[in-house]
Regions:
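Short catalytic micro-motifs in class I SAM-dependent methyltransferases
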Residues: 106-110
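Conserved N-terminal segment of class I S-adenosyl-L-methionine
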Residues: 1-91, 118, 238, 248-272
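A conserved beta-strand element that flanks and buttresses the S-adenosyl-L-methionine
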Residues: 103
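A C-terminal cap/extension of S-adenosyl-L-methionine-dependent methyltransferases
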Residues: 177-272
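Conserved S-adenosyl-L-methionine
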Residues: 167-178
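A short glycine-rich, Lys/Arg-flanked "PGG" loop and its adjoining helix->strand segment in the class I
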Residues: 115-127
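Acceptor-substrate binding/catalytic loop of class I
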Residues: 142-161, 179
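Conserved beta-strand signature within the Rossmann-like core of class I S-adenosyl-L-methionine
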Residues: 129-135
Length: 272
């Protein structure tokens, strides 16, 4: 890949609406519950807003991102607290069985072929290690694809890809159901979808901030590092609904998948 993702990356001091901050906080609160005394890798870490939360109880934390300029922002904030690696998620520069947990949040659909990343994740995870993914749901009724994205997997397609890559014990969850949204929130979703379908380029830069102000009015700056207190206040009450793996979900805006790396023998059977 040679794409520059800085324009679509949430950076420190970017203005976010409350739902964006909630999603950001929730994903790292969830990740933090899985990483105690583990060797952890976050892939597509961006500017590293969640690294402090993940690092509270880990044995080791490494973060990787494709964009050097974005990774340098994380480096400027964290200095040498954690190893930061610039690399391609499709070809991860780590030895086999190097990590116990891998987290990748809302990034699969920027990859030319996310199956390469899944196979690489299986390779560098220990047997029984954990992969935690979050993805925007393409079957959600207000879904609009983002700029620079390639392919959004549906829940069944992602589940099958994970099985093919050698993962087991798959669990699928949804958050932010449209059925629970207020009439005003649903109106905002309709307007956002209409505007972005008419002009996708408005999703970046000054246009994006203007759109957010028009739709949401109250915007807050993204922190360089989420604190436990702030994250709990913004994302601690999110309900995760278990979902079936074999059919699309049209209700939830975001999907989470939690799964385990199968044994080497199982991985070979999945990829004969």
């Amino acid at each position: 890949m040679s794409q520059d993702y800085r324009s679509i990356t949430e950076l420190p001091d970017s203005l976010l609406n409350t739902e964006q901050l909630m999603r950001l906080s929730h994903r790292y609160l969830l990740g933090a519950r899985l990483v105690t005394a583990k060797r952890v890798l976050e892939v597509a870490c961006g500017a590293g807003a969640g690294l402090g939360l993940l690092a509270q109880s880990v044995q080791q934390l490494v973060a990787a991102d494709y964009s050097l300029s974005v990774l340098q922002m994380a480096q400027a904030h964290y200095t040498r607290r954690y190893p930061l690696v610039c690399g391609d998620a499709s070809w991860l520069p780590f030895p086999a069985a190097a990590f116990d947990v891998i987290c990748c949040f809302e990034a699969l659909y920027y990859l030319p072929d996310y199956n390469h990343f899944l196979r690489e994740s299986r390779r560098i995870l220990t047997s029984g290690g954990t992969l935690l993914l979050s993805v925007s749901n393409p079957d959600w009724r207000y879904f609009v694809p983002g700029l620079l994205t390639t392919h959004y997997p549906t829940a069944p397609a992602l589940a099958q890809s994970l099985l093919n890559a050698g993962f087991t014990d798959l669990q699928l969850f949804g958050i932010l159901p449209s059925s629970a949204a207020s009439p005003l929130t649903r109106l905002r979703h309709h307007l956002r979808r209409w505007v972005l379908q008419a002009n996708p380029s408005i999703a970046t830069g000054v246009f994006a901030q203007t759109l957010k102000r028009l739709l949401y009015s109250r915007l807050l700056p993204m922190p360089a590092e989420l604190t436990p207190h702030a994250a709990a206040a913004m994302g601690g009450e999110v309900k995760m609904t278990p979902l079936p793996l074999d059919r699309p979900d049209t209700v939830h805006r975001v999907l989470y998948v939690l799964c385990s790396a199968g044994s080497s023998a199982e991985a070979c059977e999945a990829n004969p």
